[in-house]
From Swiss-Prot:
This is Ribulose-phosphate 3-epimerase 1. The active site is at residues 48, 192. PROSITE patterns: RIBUL_P_3_EPIMER_1, RIBUL_P_3_EPIMER_2. InterPro entries: Aldolase_TIM (IPR013785), Ribul_P_3_epim (IPR026019), Ribul_P_3_epim-like (IPR000056), RibuloseP-bd_barrel (IPR011060). Catalyzes the reversible epimerization of D-ribulose 5-phosphate to D-xylulose 5-phosphate.
Amino acid sequence: MHATELNTGHGSQRAIRLAPSILSADFARLGEEVCAIEAGGADLVHFDVMDNHYVPNLTIGPLVCEAIRPLVSIPIDVHLMVEPVDALIPLFAKAGANIISFHPEASRHVDRTIGLIRDHGCKAGLVLNPATPLGWLDHTLDQLDLVLLMSVNPGFGGQAFIPGVLDKVRQARARIDRQVDAGGRPVWLEIDGGVKADNIAAIARAGADTFVAGSAVFGAPDADGGYSSILYRLREAATVT
């Protein structure tokens, strides 16, 4: 892992994690692309799964996850934008996912879905769209490993960051910090959508520690085809004091 530490002012250091989204990668060279982001310093591979039902787009499934799993040692962070969600969880766990996140609207029983992810040996995340209230965390935060806040409406890459989500990030960070201060489990706070070098510092200051970036990474390769430079710039910008 390449995560760097961020001084939060909350009495502890908070790691910064970068999770390039392969939705923006060159799919004709996907194996090379995931190897390049790991070599460039990525902490996670973000894997967007869309079903043309929960969101109006269709992407990739467990076979692709299984194909890239032997190529990288960093965790695969699977974001399920599918409905219903439960049937796919065992398939992605078997394919090598380390983290599986889902949208509460896509589950009939959110608590059961979280348990299903954990039962299959993966870390569990809950994804909240820009208009989905943080109230979903009231009875789930103590079971989660990750909260993923969408800063665009899910379905397509390359969208612009919604600035109003920053206040939601601050509120989610406060909830997580209260849980940790009370002796509860730490939870990663991930942001996905429109993350770029010119806004990642503001997002980090609001409290995010894990950053999904698609076109910002894969649209800025080095001359040798790698991604070390852009990942370094993103990490430096996110490491605010």
